[in-house]
UniProtKB/Swiss-Prot annotation:
Cross-referenced PROSITE patterns: RIBOSOMAL_L36
Any single biological process term in GO: translation
Organism, scientific name: Burkholderia multivorans (strain ATCC 17616 / 249)
Family statement drawn from the similarity comment of this UniProt entry: Belongs to the bacterial ribosomal protein bL36 family.
Name listed for the protein in its UniProt record: Large ribosomal subunit protein bL36
GO molecular function terms noted in the UniProt entry: structural constituent of ribosome
GO cellular component, one term: ribosome
Gene: rpmJ
Domain of life: Bacteria
Keywords, ordered alphabetically: Ribonucleoprotein, Ribosomal protein
SUPFAM superfamilies referenced in this protein's UniProt entry, alphabetically: Ribosomal protein L36
Alphabetical list of HAMAP family matching this protein: Ribosomal_bL36
Amino acid sequence: MKVMASVKRICRNCKIIKRKGVVRVICSSDPRHKQRQG
């Protein structure tokens, strides 16, 4: 999980979602693409 100031999609499988007011990126193809804004 990377904590980034601005989250971006790295590949086409990345999805940007918002959980409890926190913007996150989840990826089904590569778990290393997981990010959260903070």
